[in-house]
Swiss-Prot record:
Reactions catalysed, as given in the entry: (2R)-2,3-dihydroxy-3-methylbutanoate = 3-methyl-2-oxobutanoate + H2O; (2R,3R)-2,3-dihydroxy-3-methylpentanoate = (S)-3-methyl-2-oxopentanoate + H2O
Organism for this UniProt entry: Neisseria meningitidis serogroup B (strain ATCC BAA-335 / MC58)
Superkingdom, natural source: Bacteria
Protein name as catalogued: Dihydroxy-acid dehydratase
Keywords: 2Fe-2S, Amino-acid biosynthesis, Branched-chain amino acid biosynthesis, Iron, Iron-sulfur, Lyase, Magnesium, Metal-binding
Length: 619
């Protein structure tokens, strides 16, 4: 039977000093002996997805105390990728994932906490907390802040029809010379109307949905709107449940509640299957690989490639389809509706554990909104947007009269009526990316699934943006942006601005983009990222010359630099001859801080999740 970790600092004569300090935090004499639950919040006023989390930690903490445990809240950092986008701030986004994981490990282990509640929401916070959960392997529950409501705009002088929109619309239209200043202003003012993570299936919402598929959060975690009063119950339930599973582990020796017992290889395959089926962000591949690595699970790019070939796309939302947003996914039954359709098609391992049900099979049955007996599920998924600008959580209680149960033409479809039988994400291999690169196929027009073009090579995102806005790119070009990987950036910037600007120039379906960097979850189009190995690690993307021909074949999962093996070898030898200047960008003027240099020194390429190679410390 495992002992409560907290006994280390709360029991014994030699811990009198520690107990004195615990008392100073409000712990009473009768509390000693109760489990100590760490509540890792990520509130910040910098990020709309986190601006409403200020009171969430204490909401959970009070429920933990009612259930018979001690709750202690602390905070982690949270970077807004949208605000950091397009300038040097984006270099810090991915490295922050490791800082978040480390900070949680430090706090939990330093204070000997017994269990953990992770209050996350946006892009790097959820994966950072997942990495920490796998590293610590103590009872853990995730509860996120929830998605933002979709924006709405009537149109200038009421001439245009009403349309829904999001952050990406603001970025694209601001760079389109055909859009007036007044129209841009209207889009800007309406794109992000409420608190919460951006309203489409971008990285934040994708990751929060994946915590449901992994079995580490409650149903609705990824889709229940941040503004809806009903979401409060998720926080309260998380507070009660963490105490229950903590006691099951420490007092009943039930290891099935531990993160590593829940997030097995089967669970990672389920999460990736669901991600492919809903056309999630390509960043999810990066993060799932990193989380699996921390969990000691043998889950690699080859597994993702295998799944991508057999899983259809049955849910298609913004940015891939502007008919649907997260609020529509919720109305259709949320993530468990997607899981149900995948299960019916035999695409899931349903014998895995979850924190809230003995098996995933049980959970799917309990949260099936098509079963009229599941009244709790039906009521939860009727939650609707309020349509009022706000930064306050739980500020409205509007409900849909009916759910979207149309599995033929609705938001979530059955496999027979899938948006496409080919999944929403794919891994490509070839001489330009020997260890793979990734593309969100859900966002690629069918006309360019096979594409051959002329390479236009840029050694930084900044140069690429200048080239695109300077009209240097024409139809048929393939924009190559290299030395932007985890090591080469360092920090693996997102390339949302280059892809958005290609669209604003009318080239969204006429060009491709390949990079060893990554993309925002808001990216769509023929945008291929995570080229591995990256240029700074000796990857062949660093050997592409201006004007080379690159051949992309998504159906056959290939990407090829059209030169001979002999020519490629000769270019590699020429690069190596540069000595200390080899595999480094030419003429790039970029300030790199000591913190970023430290990250880059240990960073691995994207095919390994861009995790730190800690083995270097031992060498």
């Amino acid at each position: 039977m495992p002992e409560y970790r907290s006994k280390t600092s709360t029991h014994g004569r030699n811990m009198a000093g520690a107990r004195a300090l615990w008392r100073a935090t409000g712990v009473m004499e009768t509390d000693f002996g109760k489990p100590i639950i760490a509540v890792a919040n990520s509130f910040t006023q910098f990020v709309p997805g986190h601006v409403h989390l200020h009171n969430m930690g204490q909401l959970v903490a009070r429920e933990i105390e009612k259930a018979g445990a001690i709750a202690k809240e602390f905070n982690t950092i949270a970077i807004d990728d949208g605000i950091a986008m397009g300038h040097s701030g984006m270099l810090y986004s991915l490295p922050s994932r490791d800082l978040i994981a480390d900070s949680i490990e430090y706090m939990v282990n330093a204070h000997c906490a017994d269990a953990l509640v992770c209050i996350s929401n946006c892009d790097k916070i959820t994966p950072g907390m997942l990495i920490a959960a796998m590293r610590l392997n103590i009872p853990t529950i995730f509860v996120s802040g929830g998605p933002m409501e979709a924006g709405k705009v009537i149109g200038v002088a009421n001439i245009q029809p009403e349309r829904r929109l999001d952050l990406i619309d603001a970025m694209i239209e601001s760079a389109d010379d055909n859009v007036s200043n007044r129209q841009v202003e209207e889009v800007e003012q309406n794109a992000c109307p409420t608190c919460g993570s951006c309203s489409g299936m971008f990285t934040a919402n994708s990751m929060n949905c994946l915590t449901e598929a992994l079995g580490l959060s409650l149903p609705g975690n990824g889709s229940y709107l941040a503004t809806h009063a009903g979401r409060k119950e998720l926080f309260l339930e998380a507070g009660r449940m963490i105490v229950e599973i903590t006691k099951r582990y420490y007092e009943q020796n039930d290891e099935t509640v531990l993160p590593r017992s829940i997030a097995t290889k089967k669970a990672f395959e389920n999460a990736m299957t669901m991600d492919i089926a809903m056309g999630g962000s390509t960043n999810t591949i990066l993060h799932l690989l990193a989380v699996a690595n921390e969990a000691g699970v043998d889950f690699k790019m080859a597994d993702i490639d295998r799944l991508s070939r057999v899983v259809p796309c049955i849910c298609k939302t913004a940015p891939n389809n502007h008919d649907y947003y997260m609020e529509d996914v919720h109305r259709a039954g949320g993530i468990f509706a997607i899981l149900k359709e995948l299960d019916k098609a035999g695409k899931l391992h349903t014998d895995v554990h979850t924190i809230h049900a003995p098996t995933l099979k049980d959970a799917i049955e309990q949260w099936d909104v098509t079963n009229p007996e599941n009244t709790r599920a039906i009521e939860r998924f009727k939650a609707a947007p309020g349509g009022v600008r706000t930064t306050q959580a739980f500020s409205q209680n509007r409900m849909w009269k009916t759910l979207d149960l149309d599995r033929e033409k609705g938001c979530i479809r059955d496999v027979a009526h899938a948006y496409s039988q080919d999944g929403g994400l794919a891994v490509l291999f070839g001489n330009i990316a020997e260890r793979g690169c990734v593309v969100k196929t859900a966002g690629v027009d069918e006309s360019i699934l096979k594409f051959t073009g002329r390479a236009r090579v840029f050694e930084s995102q900044e140069d690429a943006v200048e080239g695109i806005l300077g009209n240097q790119i024409v139809a048929g070009d393939i924009v190559i942006i290299r030395y932007e990987g985890p090591k080469g950036g360092p920090g693996m910037q997102e390339m949302l601005y280059p892809t958005s600007y290609l669209k604003s120039k009318g080239l969204g379906k006429a060009c491709a983009l390949l990079t060893d960097g990554r993309f925002s979850g808001g990216t769509s189009g023929l945008s291929i990222g995570h080229a591995s190995p990256e240029a700074a690690e000796g990857g062949a993307i660093g050997l592409v010359h201006e004007g080379d021909t690159v051949e992309i074949d998504i159906p056959n999962r290939s990407i090829h630099l059209a030169i001979s093996d002999e020519e490629l070898a000769a270019r590699r030898a020429e690069m190596e001859a540069r000595g200390s200047k080899a595999w480094k960008p030419k003429n790039r003027d970029r300030y790199v801080s000591a913190a970023l240099r430290a990250y880059g020194a240990m960073a691995t390429s994207a095919d390994k999740g861009a995790v730190r190679d800690v083995a270097q410390i031992e060498r």
